[in-house]
Structures are given as C-alpha cells and as structure tokens.
Design a protein with these regions (language model features):
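N-terminal signal-anchor transmembrane alpha helix
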Residues: 14, 18, 42-55, 159-185, ...
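Membrane-interfacial alpha-helical segments at the cytosolic side of multi-pass membrane proteins
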Residues: 96-108, 222-225, 291-310, 337-346, ...
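Hydrophobic, membrane-interfacing alpha helices
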Residues: 208, 213-218, 222, 356-639
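N-terminal transmembrane-helix/juxtamembrane module of multi-pass inner/ER membrane proteins
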Residues: 1, 156-219, 263
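Active-site-proximal inter-transmembrane loops
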Residues: 74-87, 93, 146-148, 197-201, ...
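Membrane-interface loops
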Residues: 63-68, 188, 192, 227-308, ...
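Membrane-anchoring alpha-helices and their flanking helix-loop junctions
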Residues: 1-83, 95-154
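Alpha-helical transmembrane segments of multi-pass membrane proteins
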Residues: 18-28, 173-192, 383-390, 592
Length: 639
C-alpha cells in the first residue's frame, strides 16, 4: 500500500504539480519582464501540444506493456524497453513534455514561458538525463543497451542506413533551426558593434554570387545523404552539435553585428537575397554559420567527390558571404576557425586531457619549520583576488566594505559547511562550494540591512562566481578533490601523486578517472559569458543571480553524476550535491521573479579594487594552501 501511494504521489508531482508550477513561474515572469517578445499563435502551439501528448501516451504504453512499469525514475520498469517508440527515439517522454509546455506557452501567450521557462526546462531535462538517468539505466540493465534508430549512429565503417541519415535531420538540423530562429527573434532589437573593417565598407556586392550563397543551403541539407559510413555521419552530427552550441553562445555573449551592406537587386537572385535579409538579423553573424556548415558538409561530400572539389566549393560559398555583402571578413574567418576547431576536436580533447593530467600531478610543497606551503593554494588565492577585482569593477569603487563582508562570509561559510559535511581525521580543514554560496548569501543579506545594497552585491558575486569557481578548480585538480570515478582510458586522466585525495582516500592511484574538475572549468566558462552579458544589458539583478544559480546547478548536477569521492553522502539514488542543485534551481527561479534593482553600467577598468582583492587573495591562499601536517589539532591539516 505504501509503495502504491508513493507511486501515485510521484506521478502527481511530475504530471500535475510540475507543469502547474512552470505555468505559475511563467506568469510571474511575464509580470516582471513585460518587454519580452510576444509569441502567440494557436496554429503553432496546438500541434506541438498534440504531438507531445501523443509521444507521452505512446511511450508510457510501451513502458507498461514491454517494460512492466511506468515512467518513474524512482520506480523504474523491470525490463529495459528498446522497441516501440523507444526503438526509434531516445527519451520520447521528455521530448513530448518539452513540446507540450512550449506549445502551451505559445497558445496561452506567455512570452516568458517561451524565452525563459522552456529553455530552463530543456537544460534541466538534459541535466537529469546526463547526470542521472543515463547512468542509472546502465547500472540496472548493463552497458550494452540497444541504440534507438534516431540516435547517434555507431562509430563503424559500414554504410549508413536510411534512419542513420534521418537522425542527422532530427538531431541536428531540426534543433538548429529552432534555436537559430529563436535567437534571431530574441536579438532582433539589440544593438552592437559592427564587425566590418573600414576597407570593406566600400566594396560593392556582386549579384551573381548569390547563387553560391543560396546554394549553400542545398549543399548542407543534402550532405547527410552523401555520408559513406556510419562513423563519418556520427562525427558530422557530433561536430554539428559542438560547433552550433559554440556559435550560438557567441551570438548571445558578444554584442557584435554585421548589418548587410547595401544591395541593389536587379534579378530574381538579388530579390531572393533581399528576402533572406528581411527574415534574418545582423546579430546572428559572428561567427558565420554560412561558413561553418558548408565546410562541415564538405567533409561528408569529400567521400563522394574529390576533396579539392568538395572543399573548393565550400570555399566559394564562404567567399560569397563577403561578395554578397551579408557578412564581414571577421565573421567569415571566425566561422572557418570554428570549423577548424571542431574538425580537430578529438585531437584537441586529448591534448586538453594531457594538460589536465599534468596539472593533477603537479603537487609541490615546501616546509618552513612545522609549516607546509602547498602550491595549489596559489590557484585559489588568484581566483579569490580575481573574483573580488571583478566584483569591484561591477559595483563601483564605493562598495569596498560591503564586498569584504560578503567575501568573508563566503570564506567562513565554505569552511563551516565542509566541516559539517566532509570533516574526517585525515581531512581536518576542507572547504565546500555550497557553503561558500550560503555564506555569501548571508553576507548579502547583512549588507542589505546595513547599507541597502544587498541586491547589488548578490548579483555582482553571482556574476563573478564562475570565474572564482573555474580558477579554483585548478586547486581541486592538484589536491585531488572533486575527482571523478573510474572510466575507460580514452575518457579520463590518471592521478599518481601519493598525497592526492584520489590516491590517499579513494585508493585509485594510476587508474583512469573522469576529469570532473575540467568539466566544471568548461561549464563555468560558458556560464561566465552569459551572466556577464546579462549584466552589460542592464538586466535586473535578480535575473543575473537567478541565471547563475540555475545554470550552475544544472552543470553541477551533471558533473556530480561522474564524480567518485568516497566521502560524498548519497540518499534517494542521488548525491547530496545533486539534491542541493535541485534546491538551487528553485532558488534561481524565485530570484528571477523578486523585485530588485537592475545591474548598473560597468565602469571603466580600474585597479583600485585590487587594494582589497589582493590581501583577501593572500588570506584565501593561506587558508587553502598552508597547513601544519604534524599537528592533530582541528583545522591544522589540508591533506
């Protein structure tokens, strides 16, 4: 009876309560941000709702009939389901739910639901799949699970089947088109710096080259049909994801545009280009997708055509971006640079892993009497100093006292939190990220009652936190904390330093483990650009802080799924930090709807904040890089 009641409550939570809360959140956000671009059309929304409902109903039926269970992570089916809808599409229930919510927001004319809630839902669902469900399925049913047809093709030399080619359209081109049109509409009213060089402004467009520019659409769209092996098609899909994600990030982060140069159409080709100009936006130009995609497609076409022909055509298409006046030289070179980077993605990742492993085994310490100075303290000291410098630049020169209150509260919170959660006889002075966040929030609350600037400090520290945490992860690498669990050799790094926690506490010396601190560094770099862009746009500080809390929580949830620290507390199938990440998502959602001031303009670069940032950085260096290894007193030892 208790099990049945638990299943009913679980189902109600996700089938009723969650959609209702998302609708209420969208309603509150609409009241807070009335200027969001409105999208409302039942002709577009109803088909999405119906498609989503059909996916959910069919997938639920397949789970019940074939798996002997219902779609509940806490109560998984008895058997793995790889037939029916699950034989074609990965995670059809999540896809269906995303369709229903997006379609519902469109029908109800909730712009915040479209622009904020839906992207958060998609990111959160991805975090759940990557950080929990994917791993749980392997634990339950083994690693050799059947692959849905509309998924990444296997890396084998056999020719692609028709569904492998179809997967490229479902997994890459479809999501890309939705993301591009959405971002283009979101940025259409923005202003930014032009990327044209002075010399380009006098160049007259060449009308006949519109054929090359327009031909790029067919060249790219037909490319999956030219793939000669499943492995090359798999690489095309993966590199399309990575390159598109990076370019979309650039669109959102960098205020750059390329307004098309004047073009006097004299024939149907010219009128076709003018139609494209009307529908597009100058903000979606740097780096140029019109360069990235033709070169990526040329890699597939090179299996059917001579390489010189394939890449030669891609080069002409890239040149047409300039000759038609649609892009600047900078846009074109940046787009080609993205292609070069993703084309060497495997080599670049291996090089990054090698460098990460060097840092992970770079422990050095020096003794001065009973005092030990460890080199990893320099990373976190620099992180603290750099973070406070950024906070000082964002808030202005008159807030030094308030900044130090929040900084000290964050440092003490990190220490107290870790003492409560992770302290052991061999680890008497740990520090914890979430404790630092809680302490910083307490400091911002103190500042609010003291000077009324709590929101300003809350937003500024949120905007600087990715920098602080990202740099601080270098200390994690050297010390061996926040490490991953064992993994295949090609995916990870090895720790060999005897004093590293990986060797001393987890006893995985020489074993390959996931480079989870590296994942965190990359994730924080992505988040840093987004929150700083919100600040420069003068966004409400609650939105800045909320975006950081939600994005960092989703990143941490995914990262935690691959971590392997033995002292981490787990319950309910999740690590405690994953539960905390869920709470931080809720906190971020609340922060976004609270009333508060907007981010002030960033003042010119100043070095005055270094007067307090550097001393605080030295204090953090001492707290996290200097210890007394021969003492058994509390707080004496870092390792």
């Amino acid at each position: 009876m208790k099990a049945l009641l638990a299943k009913i409550l679980y189902g109600l939570a996700f089938a009723v309560a969650l959609p209702a809360l998302l609708l209420l959140w969208a309603q509150a956000l609409d009241a807070k941000y009335p200027a969001l671009s409105r999208i409302g059309s039942w002709q577009a929304g109803v088909p999405l709702v119906l498609t989503g409902a059909a996916l959910i109903l069919r997938a639920t039926w397949d789970l019940w009939q074939l798996g002997g269970g219902l779609p509940m992570n806490a109560f998984p089916p008895k058997r793995h389901v790889a037939h029916g809808l699950y034989g074609w599409l990965p995670h059809p229930i999540y896809v269906g739910f995303a369709f229903i919510m997006l379609g519902g927001f469109i029908v109800l004319r909730r712009p915040a639901g479209v622009w904020i809630v839906s992207p958060v839902l998609w990111i959160g669902t991805t975090a759940l799949v990557v950080g929990y469900e994917r791993l749980a399925l392997r634990r339950l049913f083994g690693d050799s699970l059947p692959r849905p047809r509309l998924a990444l093709p296997p890396s084998v030399p056999e020719p692609p089947r028709w569904w492998h080619r179809a997967a490229a359209y479902v997994l890459v081109f479809g999501p890309w088109l939705v993301a591009y049109e959405g971002i283009a509409r979101l940025l259409r009213s923005q202003t930014g710096g032009e990327t044209y060089l002075t010399i380009e402004l006098g160049w007259r467009p060449v009308e006949w080259t519109v054929a090359l520019y327009a031909g790029a659409y067919a060249w790219v769209t037909l490319a999956p049909l030219a793939a000669t092996s499943q492995a090359t098609l798999r690489q095309f899909i993966r590199d399309g994801w990575v390159g598109s994600a990076f370019i979309f990030w650039c669109f959102l982060v960098f205020p750059l545009s390329a307004t098309p140069r004047p073009f006097g159409a004299t024939n149907w080709l010219g009128h076709l280009l003018e139609l494209d100009r009307v529908r597009d936006t100058a903000f979606c130009a740097f780096p140029s997708f019109h360069v990235f995609w033709p070169f990526l497609a040329a890699r597939l076409w090179a299996g059917r055509l001579p390489a010189v022909v394939s890449y030669g055509l891609a080069t002409l298409m890239a040149a047409s971006c300039v000759t038609t006046g649609m892009h600047s030289l900078v846009d074109v070179l940046a787009g080609f640079g993205v292609f070069v980077a993703v084309n060497r993605l495997d080599d670049g990742w291996r090089a990054l892993l090698r460098q990460t492993e060097r840092v992970a085994n770079s422990w050095r310490d020096w003794r001065v009497g009973r005092v030990r100075i460890i080199n990893h303290g320099g990373y976190v000291g620099a992180a603290a100093a750099g973070g406070l410098w950024l906070v000082g630049i964002l808030t202005g020169e008159s807030h030094a006292g308030e900044i130090m209150v929040v900084a000290f509260c964050g440092l003490f919170g990190a220490g107290i939190w870790a003492q409560w959660l992770e302290s052991s006889s061999g680890l008497s002075r740990p520090f914890g990220y979430y404790g630092g966040i809680f302490g910083g929030c307490l400091g911002a609350l103190i500042v609010q009652f003291w000077r009324g600037d709590g929101w300003l400090l809350f937003g500024a520290f949120a905007a600087a936190s990715p920098l602080i945490q990202g740099m601080g992860r270098l200390r994690c690498l050297v010390q061996g904390c926040c490490h991953g669990r064992p993994c295949p050799d090609t995916f990870g790094i090895r720790y060999r330093q005897p004093l590293s926690r990986v060797c001393k506490m987890a006893h995985w010396a020489g074993q390959t483990v996931y480079p989870t601190p590296l994942y965190s560094i990359i994730g924080n770099g992505i988040i840093q650009g987004l929150v700083l862009r919100l600040w420069t746009l003068g966004a409400p500080l609650g939105l800045v802080a909320g975006a950081y809390l939600i994005l960092s929580a989703c990143a941490r949830f995914m990262e935690e799924g691959y971590r392997g620290e033995p002292q981490t507390v787990r319950f309910g199938g999740l690590a405690i930090y994953q539960w905390l990440a869920l709470l931080f998502v809720i906190a971020g959602a609340v922060s976004m709807v609270l009333r508060g001031p907007s981010a002030p303009p960033i003042e010119p670069l100043t070095f005055l904040p270094l007067l307090y940032a550097l001393p605080f950085g030295l204090l953090v260096w001492f707290a996290m890089g200097v210890d007394f290894p021969e003492s058994n007193r509390r707080f004496s030892r870092l390792a």
